[in-house]
Amino acid sequence: IKFIILGCGSSMGVPRPDGFFGNCDPKNKKNYRTRCSALIKTTDENILIDTSPDLRQQLLRHKIKKIDKVFYSHMHADQTHGINDLRSFYINNRKPLEVYADKATSHYLKQNFSYCFELLITTTSL
C-alpha cells in the first residue's frame, strides 16, 4: 500500500493568488503547495481522499489514470470543488465511482454538483 499526498497547502494554496507566501520561503520549491488531496494506492485500487480544486493538476503530476473510490473528509470548497475532474474516470470506465461521505457532505455534494451524480457517481453516507 502506498499513501501519496497530492496536495498539502492551505485552503487558498501556497502562494495565495495574491502572491502571499506567509512564513514560507518562495525560493524553496517545496513551498509551492496545492490544496489538500491524497491517494491510497493498493495493488487493486486507487482510493482518493478529497477532490481539491487543484485535483486535475495533482493527478497529472502523479500520472494517476485510475480512481476507484473517493472519500470526503468534509464539505469545504477546498476539499470538494475538484469533483468535476472525476468525470473523466467515468468516461474511461463507464462505471460509477463509489463516493463515501458523511450525511452533511453527501447532501452538499448532491445539491451543488447534481450533474456528477446522474450517472457518474454513487454515494454512501457514513
Stretch-by-stretch model annotation:
Residues I1-L126:
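Binuclear metal-dependent hydrolase catalytic cores
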